[in-house]
Curated annotation (Swiss-Prot):
Ranges of residues in domain ABC transporter: 2-241
Listed PANTHER family: AMINO ACID IMPORT ATP-BINDING PROTEIN, METHIONINE IMPORT ATP-BINDING PROTEIN METN
PROSITE patterns assigned: ABC_TRANSPORTER_1, ABC_TRANSPORTER_2, METN
The entry's keywords: Amino-acid transport, ATP-binding, Cell inner membrane, Cell membrane, Membrane, Nucleotide-binding, Translocase, Transport
Protein name, per record: Methionine import ATP-binding protein MetN
InterPro entries: AAA+_ATPase (IPR003593), ABC_transporter-like_ATP-bd (IPR003439), ABC_transporter-like_CS (IPR017871), ACT-like_dom_sf (IPR045865), MetN_ABC (IPR041701), MetN_ABC_transporter-like (IPR050086), NIL_domain (IPR018449), P-loop_NTPase (IPR027417)
Pfam families: ABC_tran, NIL
Membrane topology: Peripheral membrane protein
Domain of life of the organism encoding this protein: Bacteria
UniProt-listed Gene3D superfamilies: 3.30.70.260, P-loop containing nucleotide triphosphate hydrolases
Residue numbers binding ATP: G38, R39, S40, G41, A42, G43, K44, S45
Chief location bin: membrane
Enzyme nomenclature, EC number: 7.4.2.11
Length: 344
């Protein structure tokens, strides 16, 4: 559905050119919810604005629905953009227009008749849960409701792609969850391809199928969300996952562990389970099979896209050969095993 091929974006700066994007290539499938995450200044917003050519890339190609947007003239590009809706952190509603009229605005600009507008807007307001508020003004509704208006307005032209640029970052956690649930519903019911730009790994965890991690304008990691959580490869990814799932041992645990390491019999590991592995007694089986003692130091169970995800930090006590064999056994059972060589 969306192909980004070798995108680079350079801007003039006070001390030379600023490289906002560096050779970014991504493939996003039709009907997919794809997340793009990174820290501030990583190039996320520049990238999402390149998808609909609000920012024309310095080099590279943007292909949406088989059409190379970078090759279009201005008139053809305006038509192509009708297939791409966009929502923002700031709602950008017109204060003098009602909820209904804000959603209707792009249809009015497209020259639709009053009956055509009504036939489109009313079902959209029902979809986003705002039918009873259609005659209210932006000053009379909440932030979450304003974002729902923004979503309905973005859907008014019946796009095939919805771009979300930090759309929940100004909302409280409860409202954020409700907006993410709405986006999942829209994806499910309309088959819409959604690209989520965010700095919050919690958003990625809740709604996305796949994710790309940006750092300094480059894609440093990409994959299914569950796989990225299980096996983060880049330090930026590990740090951002740590914001939602504790990766470090608590200080009180570190003090107890430190005194026992180095004796040759105690080894600390981080174990990650997913799916059916969360429900299986694999630790008990390893203890019985290899005659070891396992001390659980820290644990966490969560859910990613409806799939159970568990993380444990354990201290395994026993002969080194037996400990290694037990870890290999756990890996054979689908457990991701990482030895924590330095805990302090």
């Amino acid at each position: 559905m969306i192909e980004l091929q070798g995108l680079s974006q350079r801007f003039p700066g006070g001390s030379g050119e600023v490289h906002a994007l560096r050779d970014v290539s991504l493939s996003i499938g039709a009907g997919e919810v794809f997340g793009i995450i990174g820290r501030s200044g990583a190039g996320k917003s520049t990238l999402v604005r390149a998808i609909n050519l609000l920012n024309r890339p310095t080099s590279g190609r943007v292909i949406v629905g088989g059409q190379d947007l970078t090759a279009l003239d201005n008139g053809a590009l305006r038509l192509a953009r009708r297939d791409i809706g966009m929502i923002f952190q700031h709602f950008n509603l017109l204060s003098s227009r009602t909820v209904f009229d804000n959603v209707a605005l792009p249809l009015e600009l497209a020259g639709k008749t009053k009956s055509e507008i009504e036939a489109t807007v009313l079902p959209l307001l029902d979809l986003v849960g705002l039918s009873v508020l259609k005659d209210r003004y932006p000053s009379q509704i909440s932030g979450g409701q304003k974002q729902r208006v923004g979503i309905a307005r973005a859907l008014a032209s019946k796009p095939k792609v919805l771009l979300s640029d930090e759309a929940t970052s100004a909302l409280d956690p409860e409202t954020t969850r409700s907006i993410l649930d709405l986006l999942k519903q829209i994806n499910r019911e309309l088959g819409l391809t959604i690209v989520m730009i965010t700095h919050q790994m919690e958003v990625i965890k809740q709604v996305c199928d796949r994710v790309a991690v940006l750092e300094a304008g480059r894609v440093v990691e990409e994959g299914r969300v569950i796989d990225v959580f299980l096996r983060p490869q880049h330090e930026v990814t590990r740090a951002m996952i740590g914001d939602v799932i504790a990766q470090e041992l608590p200080e009180s645990v570190l003090k107890r562990v430190e005194s026992r390491l180095g004796n040759g019999r105690d080894h600390v590991y981080r174990l990650a389970f997913t799916g059916e592995g969360v429900d299986q007694p694999v630790l008990a089986q390893a203890i019985r099979r290899y005659g070891l003692d396992f001390n659980i130091l820290h644990g966490h169970i969560d859910e990613i896209q409806g799939q159970a995800f568990g993380s444990l930090a354990i201290m395994a006590t026993g002969e080194l050969a037996d400990v290694k064999a037990a870890m290999e056994y756990l890996q054979q059972q689908g457990v991701v095993v990482e030895e924590i060589e330095h805990v302090v």
